[in-house]
Amino acid sequence: MGPKATSGTRGRGKKVGTKTAAPLPKYKDLIVEAVVSLAERGGSSRQAIKKFIRDKYAVGAKFDGQFNLAVKRGLEAGELAQPKGPAGSIKLLKKAAQPKPEEAKRAAKPAKRVVKAAKPAKAKPAKAAKAAKPAKPVKAAKAASAVKPAARKLAKPVVKKVGSKKVATKNAVVGKKSVVSSAASKKLLAKKAVPKKTAGRKPLVGKKVVAVSRKPAAKKLAKSA
């Protein structure tokens, strides 16, 4: 095995050292690493994946058998897929895809910035609320002081005017009622008294005049005879 390794890697003395020193992970992990590193849209072929693993790791004589077995297990577990059939390219499914450590760090950095920006936003409304609290009692006190003198000034004259008006109106009404009642009583008395006096006198005057006029006529007739 020693001469074959040296003959197949002439001019690559450094890589031979890495192959012997690097530990060999599971074949399934080797396939996933190869597909992620190659980063092909439709997946990577078996030959490309095997070449990537052989160039990076020192594999044994049973590499092909272990490789095929790992692919079969990955397909059954739903981690790998072959869209073009058993002889086609190998592709990773979303479940098996793992983000690189560099991409995870980049995704974590914007999250920290968002948290820092949110802190001053929360503090601003608290400051505004504190500044607004002392202003409310001052306005309420000013409004109360302005209302009290106005209410006192208006209350006194209104009470006096109302009392005088009521008294004047009551006196005027009472005076009118007394005048009307006295005038009405006088008219009624006059009407009742007049017809009694005139009704008895008129017929007596007429009878006396007739009697007086008849007497001289009889005397004149006697003289003429």
From Swiss-Prot:
Name the family. Belongs to the histone H1/H5 family.
PROSITE patterns found in the cross-reference section? H15
Record's compositionally biased regions (Low complexity): 128-147
Q: An example Gene Ontology cellular component term from the record?
A: nucleosome
Location of region: Disordered? 1-20, 95-147
Residue ranges of the H15 domain?
23-94
One Pfam family, short name: Linker_histone
Question: What InterPro entries has UniProt attached to this entry?
Answer: H1/H5, Histone_H1/H5_H15, WH-like_DNA-bd_sf, WH_DNA-bd_sf
What keywords are annotated for this sequence in UniProt? Chromosome, DNA-binding, Nucleus
Family matches, as Gene3D superfamilies: Winged helix-like DNA-binding domain superfamily/Winged helix DNA-binding domain
Q: Does the keyword Nucleus apply?
A: yes
- Which taxonomic lineage is given here? Eukaryota, Fungi, Dikarya, Ascomycota, Saccharomycotina
Q: Which SUPFAM superfamilies match?
A: Winged helix' DNA-binding domain
Subcellular location field: Nucleus; Chromosome
Kindly indicate whether the keyword Zinc belongs to this entry: no
Briefly state the protein's biological role.
Answer: Could act as an H1-type linker histone.
- List the GO biological process terms: chromosome condensation; negative regulation of DNA recombination; nucleosome assembly
Any GO molecular function: nucleosomal DNA binding
Basic residues composition-biased segments: 107-127
Organism field: Eremothecium gossypii (strain ATCC 10895 / CBS 109.51 / FGSC 9923 / NRRL Y-1056) (Yeast)
Query: What protein name does the entry list?
Result: Histone H1
